[in-house]
Amino acid sequence: MHQTSMGIKMESHTLVFISILLCLYGADGNIVMTQSPKSMSMSVGERVTLTCKASENVVTYVSWYQQKPEQSPKLLIYGASNRYTGVPDRFTGSGSATDFTLTISSVQAEDLADYHCGQGYSYPYTFGGGTKLEIK
């Protein structure tokens, strides 16, 4: 009896792990969001361009998020190019169909963070693996 319940518990943990992987990396029929580069190191004042490519047409249903260390993700851009309330105008989103960019016109020290794109066109909604932005 004890072995059976342990087996069920381990199996449920495995299913949760697989579900997370499928959300992050896509499964058959899921849209995969691929970000590049994976990381970059920039100096204050430089222009930064991050890219996100969808495995199929997502029209303009793409959002960009910033996640600083030890903080929850913050919405920067929605609908591919709409800046969320309070987001500095140095952040600009563009693109449509499968190719999207997030540009920071003049990077600041406080922009140190991970940046993720996500698509809301087709369920399950999926996200890119992120770009880690470091400041020199």
From Swiss-Prot:
Residues 30-52 are annotated as: Framework-1. Residues 118-126 are annotated as: Complementarity-determining-3. Residues 1-29 form the signal peptide. Residues 53-63 are annotated as: Complementarity-determining-1. GO terms for cellular component: immunoglobulin complex. Residues 64-78 are annotated as: Framework-2. Residues 79-85 are annotated as: Complementarity-determining-2. GO terms for biological process: adaptive immune response; immune response. Residues 127-136 are annotated as: Framework-4. Keywords: Adaptive immunity, Immunity, Immunoglobulin, Signal. SUPFAM superfamilies: Immunoglobulin (SSF48726). InterPro entries: Ig-like_dom (IPR007110), Ig-like_dom_sf (IPR036179), Ig-like_fold (IPR013783), Ig_sub (IPR003599), Ig_V-set (IPR013106), IgV_Light_Chain (IPR050150). Residues 86-117 are annotated as: Framework-3. CDD domains: IgV_L_kappa. This is Ig kappa chain V-V region MOPC 21. It comes from Mus musculus (Mouse).
